[in-house]
Amino acid sequence: WCHEKVIYTPSDARTSSPLASVKTAYGRCGEESTFTVAALRSVGIPARQVYTPRWAHTDDNHAWVEAWVDGKWYFFGACEPEPVLNLGWFNAPASRGMLMHTKVFGRYTGQEEIMYETPNYTEINVIDNYAPTAKGSVLVTDAEGQPVADATVEFKVYNYAEFYTVATKHTDRSGHASLTAGKGDMLVWASKDGRFGYSKLSFGKDNELKITLDKNASETYSLPLDIVPPAEGANLPEVTPEQRTENDRRMAQEDSIRNAYVATFITEEQARTFAKENKLDETETVRLLIASRGNHQTLTDFLSDAVKADKAGQAISLLKVVSAKDLRDVSPEVLNDHLNNSGLPASEDFCSNVLNPRVANEMITPYKAFFRKEIPASEAEAFRKNPQALVEWCKKEITINNELNSQRIPMSPMGVWKARVADEKSRNIFFVSMARSLGIPAWIDEVTGKIQYRTFNDNNLKNGKVYDVDFEAAQQTQAPTGTLVARYRPIPSLSDPKYYSHFTLSKFRNGTFQLLNYDEGDVDMGGGATWSNLLKNGTRLDTGYYMMVTGTRMASGAVLANVTFFTIEEGKTTTVDLVMRESKDQVQVIGNFNSESTYLPIGTSEPQSILQTCGRGYYVVAVLGAGQEPTNHALRDIAALSGEFEKWGRKMVLLFPSEEQYKKFRPSEFPGLPSTITYGIDVDGAIQKQIAESMKLPNSTILPMFIIGDTFNRVVFVSQGYTIGLGEQLMKVIHGL
């Protein structure tokens, strides 16, 4: 039933509500699992969401569902049904996991390790249910070797080119803290009172790790780190051919039910007709209405009313600044409130930072009319003339209590106004919302997380000054800045490192480092900031102490990382080296595959060999699982590097296990795939079986499978299952051939 309603598609970090996911007919894993848990609970089946904060062997994370059946928890892939429980495409990745979390209502006294406790819920570690584990103990001492009590200890996994904190503990009176995790490597970071120390912990190998707080935020140096993830050891329940056939039949039926609903969404032709009838910009209107999916009626009603009120241009501007996900679930009340209570747009800055209802990842609400009514005219004018007065008002009137909002869900701006109590994040969103309601451009900087506003200069927004908001400071200031330049000596397979894929920057605050969130481009596709457009010619950063992390992910999942610490000084340029470490191993023959193996090319009735299709030389062969998340990731990764594969020029043969599987494949979901691809059917699963046997894969059913081989029947690369960055891994090997 859940698969009838929702399938997987990547999206931004805000989690849609269960009913919003139904309306859209798709969602990312966190939304699929939230929806499925809600559905199971609604019919009396105990259920919970389980997630890994970050994978260790590949970038990204994942969430799924556990249901309570006959006195035991069983897992499954949310809206991705398998014939039996305890089976999903993620069995193999989960066996390589470091941590798995879930939440339990209230206090908890069970056997699982407690990760985090609040008055409302307890977060527990359920990694023992999925992978072999070991306990790692950490002793934190000062420079004299004395144990340090109440030091903060962060356990970090390398993922998306940063060391991401997956667990935070505090040392006891003897200076100890511990964690149970999968048998791989983490970076452990300890800090207290401005001093810090760190070291690599290999779970299952290191019984106790000693960390000395002997570092401070002034030292400049660089060091390499080799990070090894847990080994794979998937335990897969048996599925009979009859069960698989019946499951495939049901999934096809469920697809047809969902697709019948999706067919009711507005079409491009209907959207174009609507735009013409209302004299709207055709290109933008069509794009916005198609993107709204099941919410298209809300947008057409809103635009129709805006045309009648002679506000069509501003209405389009409003829809352009909200997120793609907002288009799919925004309410008429929100759109009308912000259209009718924001003044007239004067610039791009106005649209983004006054008209825009969204501040961070909160549920957007209709707050502008409320604030215009509640704030006395004299105060409103004083705030506009001097936004510092609004900062002071917030400091005086809003009490901060981070303990009361234990679920960390942002309060609405109106809720903060009425309660006069909020957590820090909700207070920050409230300040920006209130400022925008008064016509003051304000925002939370996406890179640094700083709250900022722009002053008026003779009513000219463009010439106003940008100030940082510090609720602890007596006066708001413009932060002093310096410039960071990074030198990079290209390695053969990488001319322009990407942010999140190959490197990140973090700023030192309160004893630890906080990531700078530069643009990542399309979700799940990398893109965005790179070395050449960010650091080659220099970028301005606030003064302070920083860390650059770089990493080369190997096909095994291991990482060759490098960490560089440096300081940015006011008005000065700091130059560092961006080091991408390389494996010293040359491309090696790791197995065999018969290039005379045959498959059935799509659109033909005669089998053809791989050799006939590809000619002499190297080629890529893959067996795909249509509609499955790991295959979708792989195809998006390949599309992202389409130009590289075109330049290589060799054939890629992408096969499906059956004609039925091929019919489920929608190439339009993966724009930009290279023209060198040939699609076909792996008749009777012969090629899939051969790859699994010759490469000694632990399970022959996990898809996708990719190999790079040649017509001498040698294999130099193999990948199976869920891998982020597959396209890049393929190109690394190709560059080494």
Language-model region placement:
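Hydrophobic/aromatic-rich core segments of domains that either
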Residues: W1, T9-L19, T24-Y116, L187-W189, ...
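Secondary-structure boundary elements
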Residues: W1-T24, Q243-T245, E254-A419, I429
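A short, amphipathic beta-strand motif
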Residues: A134-G145, G175, G482-S495, V589
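Short, ordered, surface-exposed loop/turn motifs in non-cytosolic proteins
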Residues: K135, A143-E162, K183-D185, N386, ...
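Short, acidic Ser/Thr/Gly-rich low-complexity loop/linker segments typical of extracellular
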Residues: N159-A181, N510-L535
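Structured interaction patches on ligand/partner-binding surfaces of diverse proteins
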Residues: G194-N216, R553-R581
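Short active-site neighborhood of thiol/selenol oxidoreductases, capturing the structured segment around
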Residues: I610-I638, K651-L655
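Short, internal strand/loop/helix patches
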Residues: S668-L703
